[in-house]
């Protein structure tokens, strides 16, 4: 832990905490200050002027990033339809299960996957296990495209690399835009798409400054402030 702490302190010295960096410079600095031995994730964090207790100020969804997110995502599809089971397997789903198999997986706590995609008919069953799936971030939701009559298409999009976004109770949105191994231009394109999406989704009831703060960081690196246009 002491070694990690020392590396983080060294990385922080490269960042002026009072400076707001242009987006491309912030991306380059996030990569430079990543000291992890693995291929670190690069994340954006928005602090938004939202009161998420109000239904018209809740923000949640997903977008397809132009260069993917660099992450290998294991997808489980839940459907009783033989046709959808077949097409989902062909689309690249890692696991395809029916109603009974789904319940068995949840009961046995065998969560060897990152995302559940369900056809709408499976939701009554999944709803019973909301307290188990919710905290793990596995509960399917129509807003993120994981509850759909076309799970095969959802699998293709997820495998390409989607960015999920959701404002927490403080109005903070964290979202993955890629990996350290990706080029600066790829991360820049992905970041621009996400930023434009968040801007476009500003609720009409919000007055004043919408994006209060925007930062970027690697998995184990310091936060870097981004200059907003």
Curated annotation (Swiss-Prot):
A Gene Ontology molecular function term of the record: structural constituent of ribosome
Q: Does the keyword rRNA-binding apply?
A: yes
Question: Carries keyword rRNA-binding?
Answer: yes
Keywords from UniProt, A to Z, are: Repressor, Ribonucleoprotein, Ribosomal protein, RNA-binding, rRNA-binding, Translation regulation, tRNA-binding
Record-linked Gene3D superfamilies? 3.30.190.20, 3.40.50.790
Q: Name one GO cellular component term.
A: large ribosomal subunit
Segment forming the signal sequence:
none
Judging by the UniProt lineage, the source's domain of life is: Bacteria
Q: Which Pfam families match?
A: Ribosomal_L1
**Entry's Gene Ontology BP terms:** regulation of translation; translation
| Family in the record | Belongs to the universal ribosomal protein uL1 family.
Supply the HAMAP family for this chain: Ribosomal_uL1_B
Instruction: Give a short account of what the protein does.
Output: Binds directly to 23S rRNA. The L1 stalk is quite mobile in the ribosome, and is involved in E site tRNA release.
Quaternary context: Part of the 50S ribosomal subunit.
**Official protein name in the record:** Large ribosomal subunit protein uL1
């Amino acid at each position: 832990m002491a070694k990690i702490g020392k590396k983080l302190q060294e990385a922080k010295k490269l960042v002026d905490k009072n400076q707001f960096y242009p987006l491309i410079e912030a991306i380059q600095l996030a990569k430079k200050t990543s000291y992890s031995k693995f291929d670190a994730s690069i994340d954006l964090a928005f602090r938004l002027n939202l009161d998420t207790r109000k239904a018209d100020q809740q923000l949640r969804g997903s977008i397809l990033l132009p260069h993917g997110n660099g992450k290998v995502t294991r997808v489980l599809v839940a459907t009783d339809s033989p046709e959808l089971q077949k097409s989902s397997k062909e689309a690249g789903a890692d696991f395809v299960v029916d109603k009974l198999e789904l319940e068995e997986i949840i009961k046995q706590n065998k969560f060897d996957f990152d995302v559940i995609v369900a056809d709408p008919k499976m939701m009554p069953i999944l709803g019973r296990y909301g307290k188990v799936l919710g905290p793990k971030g596995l509960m399917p939701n129509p807003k993120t495209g994981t509850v759909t009559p076309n799970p095969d298409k959802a699998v293709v999009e997820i495998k390409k690399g989607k960015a999920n976004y959701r404002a927490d109770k403080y109005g903070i949105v964290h979202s993955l835009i890629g990996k350290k191994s990706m080029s600066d231009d790829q991360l820049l394109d992905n970041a621009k798409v996400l930023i434009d999406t968040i801007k476009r989704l500003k609720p009409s009831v919000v007055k004043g400054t919408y994006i209060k703060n925007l930062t970027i960081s690697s998995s184990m690196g310091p936060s870097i402030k981004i200059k907003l246009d």
